[in-house]
From Swiss-Prot:
Residues 34-73, 86-111 form a propeptide. The modification Phenylalanine amide is found at F82, F122, F139. It comes from the Eukaryota. Keywords: Amidation, Cleavage on pair of basic residues, Hormone, Neuropeptide, Secreted, Signal, Sulfation. It is found in: Secreted. The modification Sulfotyrosine is found at Y117, Y134. It holds the Pfam family Sulfakinin. Belongs to the gastrin/cholecystokinin family. It comes from Drosophila sechellia. The keyword Signal applies. The keyword Secreted applies. GO terms for molecular function: neuropeptide hormone activity; neuropeptide receptor binding. Drosulfakinin-0 (DSK 0) plays diverse biological roles including regulating gut muscle contraction in adults but not in larvae. This is Drosulfakinins.
């Protein structure tokens, strides 16, 4: 009888634990529901703005009223949490003044990478006696 009561308690505990887990997962938290409601409101405002924009292109649209002034103001519709998606001005990583002062070896390394025929060389370029013009290693010299 003792073993049966332990198994009954274990199954009861497991079912209660599963119900509690489902309750925590399924039932929404009030903070999440308010943020979801705010997101839905923002989306609804954007849809209304796009509809109003489409109607303003039509010549017979009557948009005089308080709804146009409320939805037409773009300052009220900006989301603060998101930053700029694209930078306004694309600038180089190194300022122009500093780039003129720096010694760039790009021209010298490009000359080393290609042979007289325009083919790219492979391998180390340490010494001319070690490799030929095509990047093949010389043996026996």
């Amino acid at each position: 009888m003792g073993l049966r009561s332990c198994t009954h308690l274990a199954t009861l505990f497991m079912t209660l634990w599963a119900l509690a887990f489902c309750f925590l997962v399924v039932v929404p938290i009030p903070a999440q529901t308010t943020s979801l409601q705010n997101a839905k409101d923002d989306r609804r405002l954007q849809e209304l703005e796009s509809k109003i924009g489409a109607e303003s292109d039509q010549p017979n649209a009557n948009l005089v009223g308080p709804s146009f002034s409320r939805f037409g103001d773009r300052r009220n519709q900006k989301t603060i949490s998101f930053g700029r998606r694209v930078p306004l001005i694309s600038r180089p990583m190194i300022p122009i003044e500093l780039d003129l002062l720096m010694d760039n070896d790009d021209e010298r390394t490009k000359a080393k990478r290609f042979d007289d025929y325009g083919h790219m060389r492979f391998g180390k370029r340490g010494g001319d006696d070690q490799f030929d013009d095509y990047g093949h290693m010389r043996f026996g010299r």
